[in-house]
A protein has these predicted regions:
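C-terminal "cap" of GNAT-fold acetyltransferases
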Residues: 2-5, 36-51, 106, 116
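Core segments of cupin and vicinal oxygen chelate
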Residues: 10-49
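Mid-chain, well-packed structural core segment of small domains
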Residues: 65-78
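Short beta->alpha transition motifs characteristic of CBS
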Residues: 12, 32, 54, 112-116
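Short hydrophobic/aromatic beta-strand element in the GNAT-like acyltransferase core
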Residues: 50, 67, 99-100
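Short acidic/glycine-enriched loop/turn segments that link adjacent beta-strands
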Residues: 36-40, 60-62, 93-98
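N-terminal beta-strand motif that seeds the catalytic metal site of vicinal oxygen chelate
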Residues: 1-18, 64-66
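Vicinal oxygen chelate
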Residues: 2, 82-116
Length: 116
């Protein structure tokens, strides 16, 4: 078996509505989710793959994150700053990419990645 795409990523979030607002600021859009017997939300980014927010406390994890590709990391950070979102750290892997790391309201880490 060979996978051909990422279908979804699931993240535990301690409070679903603030998590929805955070991911909407990153460009995600919420879509209908069936009743699964617990709080949560399903979101998509430009109709390509899904982010499933699960209404459970996040586990303690070091280094666990997912990355979103951006064309211009400076412009992305400027826009997010106007929405009250600031990076926790930034960096560059020389000749490969520029990175900015954000935390959602539950503490999950999200990387913005600009290929060099």
């Amino acid at each position: 078996m060979v996978a051909n795409a990422v279908h979804h990523v699931s993240l535990n979030v301690s409070d679903v509505p603030p998590a929805i607002q955070f991911y909407e600021a990153l460009g995600f859009r919420e879509f209908e989710r069936p009743d699964l017997g617990f709080d949560g939300a399903w979101m998509t980014l430009n109709g390509m793959g899904e982010l499933h927010l699960l209404g459970f406390p996040p586990p303690d994890a070091v280094g666990q994150h997912f990355a979103l590709q951006v064309d211009d990391i400076d412009a992305a950070l400027d826009e997010l700053t106007t929405k009250g979102i600031s990076p926790t750290r930034t960096g560059e892997i020389e000749g490969i990419c520029r990175q900015a790391f954000l935390r959602d309201p539950s503490g999950n880490e999200v990387e913005l990645n600009q290929t060099l």
